[in-house]
C-alpha cells in the first residue's frame, strides 16, 4: 500500500516530538563512549547481515555533531582501529541503528570485531508504537535505562532483545475526521494523536507533560514518506539529519503542515496502577494532541 496521509502525519509528528524532547528539553546525556558486542539473537536481522549492540538505547540522531561512523578493529581491519563511515559504497554495509543502539553490517565482516564510538544518549526515548494502550501497559516488559548504575542490557540475558526502554513516550494515531473547510474540495483533517509517557520518577514525567502542555499552537510540517530521514534499520539515510534545518526549510517554503490546536495532559495515579498490574515504581502519563490540517482530499 502507498503511504497515506495518516502515515505521514504520525511519522512527521514523531520527528517534531523527538526534537522537542532532545533539543528543547535537552533530555540527553552527551559523549558516551560505547562498545558494541555481537549478538546472534537479532530477530530482525537476516542471515546475510550481523548486528553489534551497545549497552544503550536510544542514540541521539538529530544534529550536526552526530557521529557518521564507528571505530572497528579485528578481522580484516587488523589490530588497530579504523574509522568506518556509514556509506552506501562501503563494503562493510555499515548502518548505525539509532533506535536500537547498534550497528548492522554485511555478514562477511565476521562476528569477532571490536567496535566502539562516541554517541549522545537520550534520557527519554521516543517510539511509534503499534500496540494498543492495554497491550503496552499490561503486557509489555519494560527495561529501565539505568538501574543501580547498571545499564539495562547488562541486567538481562541477550543483546538482541526488542524490549522498550524507559523513560519513554509511545506515540500513536488514535482517530481522525474530515470537516468541510472551503469550496473546491478543501477539507480540514482533524487528527487526534496520543503519547503514553512511562517514567520511573515524577520529575521526568512532570517535565515531559509540562514541556508539551506549553507546545500548543505550534506547526508540525508534513514530511513526505520518501523524505523521512531514517531507513529500515533506523539509520540516517543521508547524514547529517538536522530537524531544525528541515523545519525551517519546510515552513519557509509554505509546506503543508499540521497545526496543534489543543494539548491535554493527564496522569495515571499509583492508586489504580496496583490493580491494573502496571510495573512497580513506574509513573504513567498521557498527552493528547488535537491537530488541524486544511488540505485538498481526493473524492
Predicted ranges, named:
Residues 145-209, 269-278:
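Short, solvent-exposed beta-alpha or beta-beta edge segments that form flexible loop/patches at the rim
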Residues 2-93, 99-114, 118-135:
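Extended beta-strand solenoid/passenger and fiber regions
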Residues 1-31, 160-162, 174-189, 239-299:
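Short, charged interaction patches at domain edges and termini
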Residues 121-164, 243-256, 263:
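Intrinsically disordered, low-complexity acidic Ser/Thr-rich regulatory segments
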Residues 73-76, 87-92, 134, 143-144, ...:
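Surface-exposed intrinsically disordered loops and tails
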Residues 114-116, 190-196, 286-290:
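Beta-strand secondary-structure signal
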Residues 119-123, 175-177, 195-203, 290-297:
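Beta-strand elements of well-folded, non-transmembrane domains
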Residues 204, 214, 218-232:
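Compact, glycine/acidic-enriched structural inserts
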Amino acid at each position: 500500500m502507498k503511504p497515506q496521509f495518516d502515515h505521514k502525519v504520525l511519522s512527521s509528528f514523531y520527528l517534531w516530538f523527538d526534537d522537542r524532547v532532545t533539543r528543547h528539553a535537552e533530555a540527553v546525556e552527551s559523549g558516551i563512549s560505547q562498545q558494541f558486542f555481537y549478538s546472534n539473537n537479532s530477530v530482525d536481522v537476516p542471515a546475510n547481515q550481523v548486528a553489534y549492540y551497545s549497552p544503550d538505547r536510544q542514540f541521539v540522531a538529530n544534529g550536526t555533531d552526530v557521529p557518521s561512523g564507528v571505530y572497528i578493529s579485528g578481522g580484516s581491519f587488523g589490530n588497530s582501529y579504523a574509522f568506518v563511515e556509514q556509506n552506501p559504497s562501503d563494503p562493510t554495509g555499515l548502518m548505525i541503528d539509532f533506535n536500537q543502539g547498534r550497528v548492522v553490517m554485511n555478514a562477511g565482516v565476521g562476528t569477532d570485531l571490536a567496535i566502539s564510538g562516541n554517541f549522545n544518549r537520550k534520557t527519554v526515548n521516543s517510539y511509534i508504537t503499534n500496540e494498543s494502550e492495554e497491550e503496552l501497559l499490561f503486557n509489555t516488559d519494560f527495561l529501565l535505562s539505568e538501574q543501580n548504575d547498571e545499564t539495562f542490557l547488562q541486567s538481562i540475558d541477550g543483546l538482541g532483545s526488542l524490549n522498550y526502554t524507559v523513560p519513554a513516550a509511545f506515540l500513536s494515531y488514535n482517530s481522525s475526521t474530515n470537516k468541510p473547510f472551503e469550496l473546491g474540495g478543501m477539507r480540514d483533517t482533524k487528527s487526534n494523536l496520543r503519547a503514553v509517557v512511562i517514567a520511573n520518577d515524577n520529575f521526568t514525567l512532570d517535565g515531559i507533560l509540562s514541556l508539551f502542555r506549553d507546545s500548543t499552537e505550534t506547526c508540525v510540517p508534513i514530511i513526505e514518506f520518501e523524505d523521512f530521514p531514517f531507513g529500515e534499520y533506523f539509520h540516517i539515510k543521508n547524514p547529517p539529519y538536522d530537524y531544525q534545518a528541515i523545519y525551517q526549510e519546510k515552513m519557509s517554503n509554505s509546506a503543508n503542515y499540521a497545526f496543534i490546536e489543543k494539548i491535554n495532559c493527564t496522569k495515571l495515579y499509583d492508586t489504580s496502577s496496583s490493580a491494573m498490574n502496571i510495573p512497580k515504581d513506574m509513573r504513567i502519563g498521557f498527552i493528547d494532541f488535537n491537530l488541524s490540517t486544511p488540505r485538498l482530499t481526493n473524492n
